[in-house]
């Protein structure tokens, strides 16, 4: 997390941190071939296939066919990294847009609503991070559907709470029933 203030969220910041830690652990004796292995690992990370979780594509297809919603990917991270990950996922046909921000804050959600000319109360954010996806939206008066994932980055851990605009789901497919 030390490189996040400089580089934000993303694979490139992770790669730099990995290199810095390797230098530290080796006592500054990291060899060129070891650096090459770490760089290769970082490049592989940037090219991993973006396989959607079970039920995501089916659910997005149902929501798209209903034609009642503007579906937007709103994510944080490094622009090129996130755009490439999105394209590799194969989910582009289901969305109207992708918006990448350096961090998900109340201000960034408000700007998202302004961009699409909607009131905050019309926004439903679906996500797995209570800190980034859910809490800022609830604070603004929007709606949020929290679908926890079995692992979470320590940086994203916060105390979760109940809220009248909060939907707690176990599976992405449940969106078909609640929307």
Where do the PLM segments sit?
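Glycine-centered short loops/turns at secondary-structure junctions
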Residues: 67-68, 141
